[in-house]
């Protein structure tokens, strides 16, 4: 082996070897236990960022470790290739989304290869390929035939100037990002999949996901939002109309003082027809964004409709208000308001001077003070007629039973979860395979006409989708009848909801999935991705798996057994103020930094002399210009160093702070391993290790070696605390570096230790370990070498070091057999001259013995 560690030479050679040998190519092998490790597929944005590197390094470490355990390991990769950014980039660069996307895929693929990830490249998929989305279209038509798909009108952001639909991220301060025209809400027909039919399964099966983070499961439970309550029907005064509301708090029903309805509710529209002010309010609400995060924080506004609802139990007339916080898409589009016991209702009632009636006693039994806020806690009912004195549960049931008995109520389970709207009015996505015939009948595209191919050679104007702008594209026939194709495309979450299953059989052309391959590999054993995907992607991913199961394509209930959500990668952020006071962000690579003796930044400038403000550590992002290019780091230090730092600097689930000093430290460690191996091999071959005749020092070192193997095995396999595994190997390396190399057995022991160290580091730093394994004379390639197994016998201690105290002060240390009795330890202590002089001529009054650790002799 060469004397110096030169990663650029090693990594190129090893990667070429893997490519030629197809080391990571796998097929179904029923004689082996399978292991499917998957990292969430990347969007081909153009360049890898450190978040990608962290995600894929974690996946690669797990995959390589499992392969060393003798399992048949599948680790695939692909590209989530459709989506809005490609459209923007195409307009900006005067190209089409397809070539931009394919160029990016090629570039990023080479970046992944430079990092040494062990992917089966034969299984690579790009979701924009017709060979892929063909089966998604086919499956959608099958769901339609099963009644799982329907079309209804739904609100979108509409630019009246460009006459186009805008994604939420294209609406800036309520205006179109391109022309600055005020955006309107518009109802248009869209396709939905009935995820609500699976709400109970999605909720209940969370309990089977024992190896998913509790945080993700809680977020999904909240998103599904199962609640038990009552549907209540109110008559509308002086009208034949009825008004339906749903409540989870029937115990507060006697405290209803008004009813709020959505601006788009039939009663609002009816009243607005003769009330111009209300009509203006309805129009204003129609242009309000309906994202839940914004709904929660926006100002609550309303207007009286002049209509009244009749309380079914008291006969009271309750004013009906149109309110901007009630949505037609949610429930019945109407809510009963109990301002005494609901914070939002209280805020609205206070603003518009509506009555507030308490009907639940405070915890101390007193009437609650509602002057400053609502009392939302549950408690004993009062002010509620026949229900006074009941607790929450009894009150809930008594009111519900009464409403049911009167025929104005029905117990109901509701869900916060809404059906999945899969229509997007964009070009760069998979066409939705539906056709509207001449007579208005809507039918699925026949199977023999699939895939409905998205034309890729298009001109983007940045306004209208090319397939919407071209009337010829939509023309088709079904069974000889002319029709028009759907020009909306699928939400890109469709592609990422089933890609994991297609990886099991990417070339299969007789169906969506090859059942034999899919059921061999699925479910995924380990899924790795960010917590930001907890509710959208991970919910659709679970839902789609159940759809595949019910279509007979897979035979498991859940798509992934274990989920690891890696933390974000942070970096220093610096800026200076521009001439207009705007912040101009400077890359940390370009910041010239002064630090104090504790390493804290005290001053920073850039090459042009701007004094920089240090904004602390924040997530690497384009907006703050604080991303570190992985390629630059790989060229500077090598892929193994970058991978090692990524896995050592922080626990996988926690945020990782990018520090180049830490990268340098990882590089120094690999150089140290290389140097020790080089010095060792330079002395020639070693004799076999004679375990039976080791010295105490050699036994102790071997014990440390095998304890390290046991710890690293547990840390990598069960606990997934990769940083502590690396720390344990580093600690062992320190001991190996200090160990004497004077005898044949010293060298034989170092040979055993280095072969183990190289295998323990291999999942993290595969290139350097590949070379070291060869240099050390390891059998075959390290890619097929087994994981080291801790020798239980080696970890058993023959002797113990016991601290001896006299009257609580340490007077000596003695080595005794591990199984020595207290009497034997006392005798041995008496023979130790440093101890003996303190026992001369005194009486031992008391003995405190902690087996194998401490002997305290109390004398007087």
Swiss-Prot record:
Q: Where in the cell?
A: Cytoplasm
The record's catalysed reaction(s) read: tRNA(Leu) + L-leucine + ATP = L-leucyl-tRNA(Leu) + AMP + diphosphate
Q: Where does ATP bind?
A: 622
> GO molecular-function annotation terms?
aminoacyl-tRNA deacylase activity; ATP binding; leucine-tRNA ligase activity
Indicate where this protein is primarily found: cytoplasm
Instruction: Supply the EC number(s).
Output: 6.1.1.4
CDD domains registered for this protein in UniProt: Anticodon_Ia_Leu_BEm, LeuRS_core
Cytoplasm: present as a keyword of the record? yes
Look up the domain of life of the source.
Answer: Bacteria
GO terms, biological process: leucyl-tRNA aminoacylation
Kindly indicate where the leader peptide sits in this chain: none
| One GO CC annotation | cytosol
PROSITE patterns attached to this UniProt entry? AA_TRNA_LIGASE_I (PS00178)
User: Motif 'HIGH' region at which residues?
Assistant: 42-52
Per its UniProt record, what Pfam families does this chain match?
Answer: Anticodon_1, tRNA-synt_1, tRNA-synt_1_2, tRNA-synt_1g
Motif annotated as 'KMSKS' region, chain positions:
619-623
Sorted UniProt keywords? Aminoacyl-tRNA synthetase, ATP-binding, Cytoplasm, Ligase, Nucleotide-binding, Protein biosynthesis
The similarity comment for this entry is:
Belongs to the class-I aminoacyl-tRNA synthetase family.
Q: What is this protein called?
A: Leucine--tRNA ligase
Species this protein is from: Yersinia enterocolitica serotype O:8 / biotype 1B (strain NCTC 13174 / 8081)
């Amino acid at each position: 082996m060469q004397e110096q560690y030169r990663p650029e030479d090693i990594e190129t050679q090893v990667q070429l070897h893997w490519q030629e040998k197809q080391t990571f190519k796998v097929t179904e092998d029923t004689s082996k236990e399978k292991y499917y490790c998957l990292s969430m597929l990347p969007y081909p944005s153009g360049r890898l960022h450190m978040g990608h590197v962290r995600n894929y390094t974690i996946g690669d470490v797990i995959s390589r470790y499992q392969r060393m355990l003798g399992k048949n390991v599948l680790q695939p990769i692909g590209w989530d290739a459709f989506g809005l950014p490609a459209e923007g980039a195409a307009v900006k660069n005067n190209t089409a989304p397809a070539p931009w996307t394919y160029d990016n895929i090629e570039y990023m693929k080479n970046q992944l290869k430079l990092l040494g990830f062990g992917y089966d490249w034969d299984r690579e998929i790009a979701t924009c390929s017709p060979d892929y989305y063909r089966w998604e279209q086919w499956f959608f038509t099958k769901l339609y035939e099963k009644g799982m798909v329907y079309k209804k009108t739904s609100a979108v952001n509409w630019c009246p100037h460009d006459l186009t639909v805008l994604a939420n991220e294209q609406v800036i301060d309520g205006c179109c990002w391109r022309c600055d025209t005020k955006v309107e809400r518009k109802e248009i027909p869209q396709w939905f999949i009935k995820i609500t039919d699976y709400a109970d399964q999605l909720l209940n099966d969370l309990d089977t996901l024992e190896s998913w983070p509790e945080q993700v499961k809680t977020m999904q439970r909240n998103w599904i939002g199962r609640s038990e309550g009552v549907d209540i029907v109110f008559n509308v005064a002086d009208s034949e109309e009825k008004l339906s509301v749903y409540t989870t708090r029937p115990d507060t029903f006697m405290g209803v003082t008004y009813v709020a309805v959505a601006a788009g509710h039939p009663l609002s529209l009816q009243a607005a027809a003769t009330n111009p002010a209300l009509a203006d309010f309805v129009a204003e609400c129609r242009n309000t964004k309906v994202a839940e995060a914004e709904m929660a924080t926006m100002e609550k506004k309303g207007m009286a409709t002049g209509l009244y609802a009749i309380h079914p139990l008291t006969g009271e007339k309750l004013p009906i208000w149109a309110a901007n916080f009630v949505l037609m898409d949610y429930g019945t589009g109407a809510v009963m308001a109990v301002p005494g016991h609901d914070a939002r209702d209280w805020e609205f009632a206070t603003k518009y001077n509506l009555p507030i009636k308490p009907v639940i006693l405070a915890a101390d039994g007193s009437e609650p003070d509602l002057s400053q806020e609502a009392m939302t806690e549950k408690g004993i009912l009062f002010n509620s007629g026949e229900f006074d004195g009941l607790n929450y549960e009894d009150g809930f049931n008594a009111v519900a039973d009464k409403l049911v008995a009167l025929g104005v109520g029905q117990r109901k389970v509701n869900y916060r979860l809404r059906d999945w709207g899969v229509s997007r009015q964009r070009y760069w996505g998979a066409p939705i395979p539906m056709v509207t015939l001449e007579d208005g009948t809507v039918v699925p595209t026949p199977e023999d006409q699939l895939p409905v191919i998205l034309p890729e050679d298009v001109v983007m104007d940045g306004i209208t989708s090319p397939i919407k702008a071209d009337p010829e594209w939509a023309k088709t026939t079904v069974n000889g009848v002319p029709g028009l194709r759907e020009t909306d495309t699928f939400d890109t979450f469709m592609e990422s909801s089933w890609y994991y299953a297609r990886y099991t059989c990417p070339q299969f052309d007789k169906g969506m999935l090859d059942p034999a391959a899919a059921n061999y590999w699925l479910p995924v054993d380990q899924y790795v991705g960010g917590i930001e995907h907890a509710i959208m992607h991970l919910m659709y991913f679970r839902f789609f798996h159940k759809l595949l199961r019910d279509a007979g394509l897979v035979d498991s209930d859940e798509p992934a057994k274990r989920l690891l959500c890696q933390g974000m990668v942070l970096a220093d952020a610096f800026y200076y103020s521009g001439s207009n006071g705007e912040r101009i962000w400077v890359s940390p690579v370009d910041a010239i930094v002064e630090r104090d003796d504790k390493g804290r930044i005290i001053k920073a400038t850039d090459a042009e002399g701007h004094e920089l403000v240090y904004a602390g550590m924040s997530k690497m992002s384009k907006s703050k210009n604080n991303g570190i290019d992985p390629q630059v780091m790989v060229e500077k230090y090598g892929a193994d160093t970058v991978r090692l730092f990524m896995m050592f600097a922080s626990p996988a689930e926690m945020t990782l702070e990018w520090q180049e000093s830490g990268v340098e430290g990882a590089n120094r460690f690999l150089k140290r391993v290389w140097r020790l191996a080089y010095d060792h091999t330079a002395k020639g071959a070693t004799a076999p290790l004679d375990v039976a005749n080791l010295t105490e020092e050699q036994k102790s070192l071997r014990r440390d070696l095998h304890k390290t193997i046991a710890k690293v095995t547990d840390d990598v396999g069960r606990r997934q605390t990769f940083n502590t595994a690396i720390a344990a190997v580093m600690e062992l390396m320190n001991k190996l570096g200090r160990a004497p190399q004077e005898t044949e057995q010293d060298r034989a022991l170092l040979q055993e230790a280095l072969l183990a160290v190289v295998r323990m580091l291999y999942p993290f730093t595969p290139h350097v370990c590949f070379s070291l394994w060869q240099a050390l004379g390891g059998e075959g390639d390290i890619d097929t070498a087994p994981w080291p197994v801790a020798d239980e016998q080696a970890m058993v201690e023959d002797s113990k070091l016991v601290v001896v105290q006299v009257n609580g002060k340490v007077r000596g240390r003695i080595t005794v057999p591990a199984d020595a009795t207290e009497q034997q330890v006392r005798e041995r202590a008496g023979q130790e001259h440093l101890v003996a002089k303190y026992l001369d001529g005194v009486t031992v009054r008391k003995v405190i013995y902690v087996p194998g650790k401490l002997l305290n002799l109390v004398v007087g």
